[in-house]
Structures are given as C-alpha cells and as structure tokens.
Amino acid sequence: MSLSRLLIKDFRNIENADLALSPGFNFLVGANGSGKTSVLEAIYTLGHGRAFRSLQIGRVIRHEQEAFVLHGRLQGEERETSIGLTKDKQGDSKVRIDGTDGHKVAELAHLMPMQLITPEGFTLLNGGPKYRRAFLDWGCFHNEAGFFTAWSNLKRLLKQRNAALRQVSRYEQLRPWDKELIPLAEQISTWRAEYSSAIAQDMADTCQQFLPEFSLTFSFQRGWEKETDYADVLERSFERDRILTYTAHGPHKADFRIRADGAPVEDTLSRGQLKLLMCALRLAQGEFLTRESGRRCLYLIDDFASELDDARRGLLASRLKATQSQVFVSAISAEHVLDMSDKNSKMFSVEKGKITD
C-alpha cells in the first residue's frame, strides 16, 4: 500500500495541511525549522501512535491546541483504506479505520510498515540494546501473527514479577509468574533468533554493497546463557534479582550485535559509514518483508544529504528506487534530491509550517 493522501491538523508547527502524494518519491524541501521533518513525523505517528522526536505529547500538539488529528488514505492494488489518529494532551488516542472507531495502534502499524532513517537513528548502532531489540521486533511483528500479543504479555508479566520481587522471600512465591513467563520468553526468543537468521544474508549482501571495505558479522544474543533453560536461570538468579528488584535475565535483555572486521561498529566506523550501515539495514529489512509477504514499506528519510557524499547519496537513491516503494525525503535544498526525481515524483516546499507543491 502507498499513502495517497495525508491530512495534518495541529501537529507540531503545522496548523492544517492536505497533501496529495506520489506512490513513488515525495520530496520535502525547506530550511531548518520549516516543518519538513514534522511532515515525516506525522506520517510516522499515523503508523505508530507516537512521534519519533519526543515522547511528550504536549510537544507534538501545536501550541495552545488540545489535540492533533492525522488522517490518511492508503491505496492498495485492490482497495483503498481510510485511517485516522487523534491524540489529546492527556495522551488519550482514538484510532479510526474505514470510518469505524475502537481500533488499536497495532492495526495501523500492520497496515503501514515503514522504515525510518533520521540523524537520530544512529542509536540503532551506537545506542543501547533496546534499539536493536526494536529492530528485530519490527521484523517479528510483521512476520509472526502472534508476536505482538506475546510481546505485550511478556511486558506485563515482567512488570508484575519485578513488583513481586520487592515482596517475596522465597523463589516458590514467584512460580505463578514464572509459569507464564517462561514459555513466552522462549517463544519470543525463538522468533527473534529465526528472524535474525532469515534476514542475515539480506543484510550481509546489502551491507557489502554499501560498505565493501568492511567484513560485517551479525549475532543474536537472547538475553541469557546459551544452552541453558530459562527456568533454571530464573531460579538460580532469584537472590540477585530480589536484591536488584528486577529480572536481570531474559528476552528483555536480548541484543543483536553488529561487528566490522571483528570490532563493534560503533568503535570502527565513521559517522558517514554508520549512516550507510543504518540505511543498508533498513533497506534489507524492508526488502525482506516485501519478498516474504508481498507488502512494501514506506521509507521516511530525514535530512537526506547529511553525512553522505554525492556517490553514496546516489547509491542510496538507486537502491530506494529499486524497491518500488513509496519514499518520503526531506532536504534543505532541492539540489540535493533533483537527481532522484522523475516524472512520478512530487516536490513539496515547506516554510513555517505551510506546505505547497
């Protein structure tokens, strides 16, 4: 599916916008602070229920307004789907799909698989493990129908178990939680391991094209010792967990490590190389989804020109075109994206929250 129309109301510095979009490349050009990133963020929020630059809802809603409203029209090969999201200052959300209320944000995420490439996205490579878990979980969510429910239940059980650790004195008192937690943890870890194995070749091939000077390796770490039953780990770690008042081992501690020539990429690669690697990983993940399910991602790319020279921008542009996906690109100057444009592209000018084509 592609987003054929986007309506934005009271989001960031955008009062009202109604955009007719290209199913191919859409360029957002404007000075820093003009609102071009806000358009990308509106699309991302419509598909995720939250913004990517701030978790504080008050910063996302336009000044002195009570709520933002986002509406989109998704065009598929056989049908059109209408989607909407409203969120107020209290954080209450309303999701509407095809004119009916009561839907979940996860349904929007399923309808709009998207890949985000921003200057802040370096956290995938040099941030904590939670960012790389999120990378794997995106793939599991779109590959495994039961993943989201299992993941939600895991979060709930871990929260309850951690609260119980403050009150219990013997491991036997935790067994009711662990009886539910253990099979969930093992299932989620299995899904993550299978996904990381399945996508490994795609990542290796794409990374080789973007960074041929490095030998890159990927390894999934499930969050507890290899060849050890999670039940044994939980029981053996009880006293330490009780002192810490949290569960120290499990899928919530998993990681997906990436090395270049045997060393952590964050210690080896320059910022430009890290951006190329981030782009390669996002592309590989999107292309894997298309091959496995026939569904195409939306790609959101903020500040396209930063950190990349002309040759590398050209490589990224050609790979994005090859996906035949819908792509949204922000840039300070139209010169940075003109070589990516064709007769099906749309160029939007953004100035002080006003968007024109």
Curated annotation (Swiss-Prot):
What are the GO cellular component annotations?
cytoplasm
- The reply to whether GTP-binding figures as a keyword in the UniProt entry is no
The Swiss-Prot or TrEMBL record annotates one GO molecular function as: ATP binding
Pfam families, alphabetically?
Answer: SMC_N
Q: Which InterPro entries does the record associate with it?
A: DNA-binding_RecF (IPR001238), DNA-binding_RecF_CS (IPR018078), P-loop_NTPase (IPR027417), RecF/RecN/SMC_N (IPR003395), RecF_2 (IPR042174)
Q: Which cysteine-cysteine pairs are annotated as disulfide bonds in the entry?
A: none
User: What family is it from?
Assistant: Belongs to the RecF family.
Q: What is the recorded function of this protein according to its Swiss-Prot or TrEMBL entry?
A: The RecF protein is involved in DNA metabolism; it is required for DNA replication and normal SOS inducibility. RecF binds preferentially to single-stranded, linear DNA. It also seems to bind ATP.
Matching entries from HAMAP family are given as:
RecF (MF_00365)
Q: What is this protein called?
A: DNA replication and repair protein RecF
Which organism is this entry from? Salmonella arizonae (strain ATCC BAA-731 / CDC346-86 / RSK2980)
